[in-house]
Structures are given as structure tokens and as C-alpha cells.
């Protein structure tokens, strides 16, 4: 790739978390029985009139503010005309010449370097239905539950130069929509998805190469792998003396390849024109001021604050702010014990382990942040060892019990009585003379063996620091 550079732009669709659809009152609930959340409007019956969802307009504007866009006080819905079985009206209601937001940007960090990625526009549109193909009865079905669900499409400038930058940008957008509460960010269910436009050009050339549009990118990993494959494919085409063809390509995650769907000659002419059934969307200045004032602290600002206020590394701050609820949990736990680095370590280790095993988010568990803060406090006070804390962490997450009362009730309080530990140390030394001689002969790693023996004798409750001190003293 040394002779070429990649040019990448992303088109990201985020399904808005409204309770009703963009132009009717049907539910947006995911997973309902097919064709149960459908009415005359979202099924495209003649003679009905759409009514815009005010909450969707607010959410789109908030997103624009979060990524430094100009929010247009007047925007226009347009009809995007094409035929597909899951599009009952024969057109999609979108925005074209006058979108709700435009001219924004988002900063990303990759390998310690900060890049500014331009955002061309954000526009509102209604989603299509879903085609379901059944091989068993050789038939295809259409589920219109998704038809009319509100989306925003976030279109970037072609400013990314690698798959890593594209994923960093996508993750940054994902964090923002989740922080704002306007989208649940679920890529598996399709509520956050993207298409990638990828081309390559000789380094130093200003003119863009011929691009391919990649579809079926339903995870961050697939976005990275698909773009990497497509860059390599286009390079092979050029090095073989052929020309890259402008086309739409589907990513096959199993084979890790992109496959041609349709070429340029098959591309749609959407024949956009303003929707005659919808008035222009007008946003009052008072609403814009109020929405901007209500914006939460956004992920990048929170990362910077965590690094300065809590002295965390950028990596730790990134992990803890990736989810708004997780960041809130961290701050509440830190407030309970005053040990931000200890809290960060425990959350990134034991807590994330438990969340991943249960496949849940932190706001779905019984443990409260005050309990985690108390756990840090009793570890630091020597009431229990870090090992005991790790052993009981799953139960604390499951039950929501406060740690100090829990360990006292279970008899897990750490032994810090020197005489009691010294007895266990003396026994371990007396029972293992060969290991004692080997240790004295230079095999100092055997201290871990003796530590294990003593922990077995004390059922894991001996103070590790005191055990180490006594062992080193007695073994010489």
C-alpha cells in the first residue's frame, strides 16, 4: 500500500429512540410479531397524510449540535423514488437539498494522532420494511413493522485514510448517540449501521479514485475487515493494470470478502423532489437554545476530564467512558471511596468480566456503585485481600450486598494477626525442607509456593503483605 493511500467516507444510519414512527403513531418496538405495528400511513395506502414526529426532529438537531453542525432552522423533506418490495409507498421520505444539519466535524484519535473528520450533513428519513426470504417454502415475505421508523443518516466527508480511522470515527459516533439517548446503538438489531465508500489513489494525487460502496457492515470488526479487504482488492486491480469499477459491494463476513451487488450502470436515479404532503420543518430559536443547553457532557469531553480530574491514562478513560452508565458508575464509586485508580482497576477487571459473562450493561445489575466503592475501601483497609474480593465479586454483583457486612457474615475477614500468620508460616517451612533448601540455594521464585501453602492453611484469609514479610524474614 506504500504507493497508494485509501480514501474512506462513511454513511451511518442511527434509528432514533422514539416510541412512535416518523410520520404516524405506530410503535417502533423491536421484535413484535410481523406486520403488527403497521397502519395505513406506514404501509403506503393512498389518500393518507404523514404527520412529522416532533421528538425525532429534536433528536436529529441534538445530534447535529453534538458533532458541531449548523442546525438549519428550516429543513425540507423530499421523496427519494425507487422500487423495492419492502418500500410500500414506492418512495422513501428523506431530505436532500435542505437537510436538518450540515457542515460539522468530529475529532478522532488513532495511534496517538488526532484527526478531524468532516461531517457533510445529517438528514432525517423513514426506514424501509424488511424482506424475509424462506428457502423452505420457496417464498419471500415482507414485514412492515420497521417501515416508517425514524432514522438519521450521518454522512462524513471522505477524510479517513485507513480502516482504523474509520472504526475510530464510527465508535465515536456510536458513543455520542448512546450518550445523547437518541439511539440504543444496537448493531446486531440494525439500529446503528453503516455503509462505507472506499477508494484508493496514488500518494500525492489530489483527484479521488473510483469508489466502491460496501454494505452489510453490522459490527465494528466487520467494518474494519471489510475496508481492509477492499483496499487490498483495489490495489491488486490497479497493480494488474486494470481499472477499479464503481459499484456496490456486499461484505461476506464468513469468507471475509466483498462481492459485487450492482455496478454503476445499475445505480438508482432517485429523482428527489420536495414532498408535497409535508410542510418545511421549522425549528424555533428558543427550542435550539434549550436543546443545546440540555446536551450532556459528551464522551470526548468526559475522557479529557477523567484524565485530568482522576489522573487516569487515556486508555483507562476511554474504556470507562465508552458507556454513559459505566462512566456514571465510576464517578459514583469513586465518590464513595476517594480512590479513582483503584476503582478503575476493579471496574476494568472484575466488573467488566461479570458484565461480559452475563451479557448485560452495568445499569442492569444489582450492585450499586457505593458497594464497589466500599469494596475498594475495605481492601485498602486490609479487611479482605484482593483475592477474596475477586472471589466474592460475582456474588456481590448478583445480590447487591454491601461488601463489609457480606465478608463479616461469611467469616472472610482477612487475618492480620502476626502470631496467627507466623504459626502458619512456621508450619509451611517445617513441612517443606527440600523447598527451603532450594530457596536458600537461589530459587527465590519458590516464595510463591510457600505463599500458596500458607493461604491454603488460612483458607485464603492471611494478609498477603504480612505473609511475604514473614517468609522473607524466616527464609533469609
Swiss-Prot record:
GO terms for biological process: glutaminyl-tRNAGln biosynthesis via transamidation; translation. It is an enzyme of class 6 (ligase). SUPFAM superfamilies: GatB/YqeY motif, Glutamine synthetase/guanido kinase. It catalyses: L-glutamyl-tRNA(Gln) + L-glutamine + ATP + H2O = L-glutaminyl-tRNA(Gln) + L-glutamate + ADP + phosphate + H(+); L-aspartyl-tRNA(Asn) + L-glutamine + ATP + H2O = L-asparaginyl-tRNA(Asn) + L-glutamate + ADP + phosphate + 2 H(+). GO terms for molecular function: asparaginyl-tRNA synthase (glutamine-hydrolyzing) activity; ATP binding; glutaminyl-tRNA synthase (glutamine-hydrolyzing) activity. It holds the Pfam family GatB_Yqey. Its EC number is 6.3.5.-. Keywords: ATP-binding, Ligase, Nucleotide-binding, Protein biosynthesis. InterPro entries: Asn/Gln-tRNA_amidoTrfase_suB/E, Asn/Gln-tRNA_Trfase_suB/E_cat, Asn/Gln_amidotransferase, Asn/Gln_tRNA_amidoTrase-B-like, GatB, GatB_C_1, GatB_Yqey_C_2, Gln-tRNA_amidoTrfase_suB_CS. Gene3D superfamilies: 1.10.10.410, GatB domain, N-terminal subdomain. Allows the formation of correctly charged Asn-tRNA(Asn) or Gln-tRNA(Gln) through the transamidation of misacylated Asp-tRNA(Asn) or Glu-tRNA(Gln) in organisms which lack either or both of asparaginyl-tRNA or glutaminyl-tRNA synthetases. The reaction takes place in the presence of glutamine and ATP through an activated phospho-Asp-tRNA(Asn) or phospho-Glu-tRNA(Gln). HAMAP family: GatB. Belongs to the GatB/GatE family. GatB subfamily. Heterotrimer of A, B and C subunits. PANTHER family: GLUTAMYL-TRNA GLN AMIDOTRANSFERASE SUBUNIT B MITOCHONDRIAL AND PROKARYOTIC PET112-RELATED (PTHR11659), GLUTAMYL-TRNA(GLN) AMIDOTRANSFERASE SUBUNIT B, MITOCHONDRIAL (PTHR11659:SF0). This is Aspartyl/glutamyl-tRNA(Asn/Gln) amidotransferase subunit B. It comes from Nitratidesulfovibrio vulgaris (strain DSM 19637 / Miyazaki F). The gene is gatB.
Amino acid at each position: 500500500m506504500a504507493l497508494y493511500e485509501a480514501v474512506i467516507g462513511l454513511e451511518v444510519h442511527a434509528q432514533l429512540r422514539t416510541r412512535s414512527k416518523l410520520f404516524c403513531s405506530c410503535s417502533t418496538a423491536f421484535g413484535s410479531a410481523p406486520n403488527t405495528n403497521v397502519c395505513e400511513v406506514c404501509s403506503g395506502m393512498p389518500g393518507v397524510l404523514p404527520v412529522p414526529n416532533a421528538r425525532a426532529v429534536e433528536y436529529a438537531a441534538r445530534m447535529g449540535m453534538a458533532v458541531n453542525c449548523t442546525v438549519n432552522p428550516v429543513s425540507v423533506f423530499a421523496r427519494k423514488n425507487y422500487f423495492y418490495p419492502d418500500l410500500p409507498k414506492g418512495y422513501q421520505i428523506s431530505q436532500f437539498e435542505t437537510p436538518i444539519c450540515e457542515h460539522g466535524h468530529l475529532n478522532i484519535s488513532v495511534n496517538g494522532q488526532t484527526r478531524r473528520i468532516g461531517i457533510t450533513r445529517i438528514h432525517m428519513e423513514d426506514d424501509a420494511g424488511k424482506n424475509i426470504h424462506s428457502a423452505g417454502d420457496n417464498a419471500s415475505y415482507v414485514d412492515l413493522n420497521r417501515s416508517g421508523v425514524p432514522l438519521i443518516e450521518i454522512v462524513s466527508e471522505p477524510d479517513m485514510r485507513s480502516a482504523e480511522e474509520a472504526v475510530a470515527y464510527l465508535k465515536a459516533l456510536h458513543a455520542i448517540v448512546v450518550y445523547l439517548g437518541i439511539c440504543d446503538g444496537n448493531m446486531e438489531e440494525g439500529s446503528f449501521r453503516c455503509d462505507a465508500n472506499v477508494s484508493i489513489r496514488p500518494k500525492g494525487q489530489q483527484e479521488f479514485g473510483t469508489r466502491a460502496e460496501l454494505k452489510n457492515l453490522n459490527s465494528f470488526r466487520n467494518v474494519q475487515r471489510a475496508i481492509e479487504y477492499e483496499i487490498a482488492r483495489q490495489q491488486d486491480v490497479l497493480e494488474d493494470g486494470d481499472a477499479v469499477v464503481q459499484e456496490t459491494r456486499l461484505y461476506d463476513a464468513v469468507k471475509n470478502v466483498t462481492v459485487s451487488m450492482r455496478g454503476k450502470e445499475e445505480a438508482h436515479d432517485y429523482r428527489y423532489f420536495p414532498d408535497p404532503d409535508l410542510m418545511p420543518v421549522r425549528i424555533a430559536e428558543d427550542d435550539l437554545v434549550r436543546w443545546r443547553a440540555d446536551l450532556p457532557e459528551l464522551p470526548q469531553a468526559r475522557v479529557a476530564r477523567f484524565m485530568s480530574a482522576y489522573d487516569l491514562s487515556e486508555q483507562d478513560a476511554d474504556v470507562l467512558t465508552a458507556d454513559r452508565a459505566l462512566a456514571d458508575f465510576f464517578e459514583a464509586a469513586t465518590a464513595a471511596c476517594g480512590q479513582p485508580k483503584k476503582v478503575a482497576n476493579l471496574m476494568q477487571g472484575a466488573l467488566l468480566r461479570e458484565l461480559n459473562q452475563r451479557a448485560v450493561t452495568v445499569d442492569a445489575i444489582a450492585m450499586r456503585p457505593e458497594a464497589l466503592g466500599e469494596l475498594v475501601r475495605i481492601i485498602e483497609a486490609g479487611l479482605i485481600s484482593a483475592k477474596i474480593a475477586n472471589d466474592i465479586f460475582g456474588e456481590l454483583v448478583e445480590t447487591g450486598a454491601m461488601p463489609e457486612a457480606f465478608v463479616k457474615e461469611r467469616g472472610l475477614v482477612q487475618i492480620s494477626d502476626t502470631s496467627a500468620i507466623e504459626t502458619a508460616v512456621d508450619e509451611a517451612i517445617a513441612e517443606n525442607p527440600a523447598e527451603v533448601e532450594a530457596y536458600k540455594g537461589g530459587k527465590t521464585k519458590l516464595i510463591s509456593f510457600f505463599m500458596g501453602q500458607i493461604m491454603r492453611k488460612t483458607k485464603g484469609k492471611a494478609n498477603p503483605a504480612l505473609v511475604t514479610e514473614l517468609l522473607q524474614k524466616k527464609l533469609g
